[in-house]
Regions:
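Structured, basic alpha/beta domains of bacterial-type, RNA-associated proteins
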Residues: 2-108
Length: 108
């Protein structure tokens, strides 16, 4: 299993129930692809530096995921088909950080 830090951005106009549903669907996708979520954070609604798909803000979600290397491309393909997710980034890491991300510290 490969380790990834995974961030994805969701549309600003989602209701709280739609937002939760979109996150749960993405978590289910990861689990269906033989992956698991080791840690997750919700960074909340943030301003974007520039509009992305007509969104000036986005909800940011961060996850540490374990998923087989050969399945990460399949996950990315499913993310591309999801109209609620406007951008994502998955970075392969050797080990997960032990401390919360700076974005969570910023909220406090």
């Amino acid at each position: 299993m490969a380790l990834f830090e995974h961030v994805f951005m969701l549309r600003q106009d989602l209701s709280s129930t739609d937002l939760e549903s979109a996150i749960e669907n993405h978590e289910k996708t990861i689990n269906d692809l033989e992956g698991s979520i080791a840690y997750k954070e919700s960074w909340g609604l943030k301003n974007l530096s520039y509009p992305i798909k007509n969104n000036k803000k986005a909800f940011f979600e961060y996850m540490n995921i374990e998923i087989p290397n050969e399945r990460i491309q399949e996950m990315n393909s499913k993310l591309n088909l999801n109209e609620n997710i406007i951008r994502y980034l998955s970075i392969k890491v050797r080990k997960f950080e032990e401390t919360p991300s700076p974005m969570v510290k910023e909220k406090d």
